[in-house]
Amino acid sequence: SIIAKKKFVRKALKNFQINFIKKSKLVIVEGRDIGSKIMPNADLKLFFTCSVKEKAKRRLREFQAQNKNIKLKEVEKALIQRDKDDTERKISPLIKAKNAVLVDTTKLNIKQMKVKLINLVKNSIKIKYGNL
């Protein structure tokens, strides 16, 4: 977004996020640069990806549910541009953190995704704390 490109906004949000996270004993945080900038030492970092075609189909269903008339090709084009903008922007570009687990959601439905995420979290807890 236009606001996310502003350096002073990113800095203020970074400070707020870091302070919020420090006050929490256990926290799940989502965001573009959480794993690479805000919480580089997090116990578990996930980086989600999905094919453009599948993202566009999902987004189109959202638009259709809102009775918006838009074509799949238009949605694909917008998503391709958004991904390009996100990965190439100068301030906090979208990158996969070094030790983040890549999660490709292209072929997963919501239930499968939920199971996968729960298993990743359980495994991370087991590695850090053993069997609880």
Predicted regions and their residues:
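NTP-dependent small-molecule kinase module
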Residues: 60-65, 84-132
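Short helix-capping segments at alpha-helix termini
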Residues: 67-71
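Core, highly hydrophobic multi-pass alpha-helical transmembrane subunits of bioenergetic inner membranes
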Residues: 51-52, 79, 127-132
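Glycine/charge-rich, flexible interdomain linkers and switch-proximal surface loops
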Residues: 29-37, 76, 92-100
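ATP-dependent small-molecule kinase phosphotransfer cores
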Residues: 1-26, 53, 73-90, 101, ...
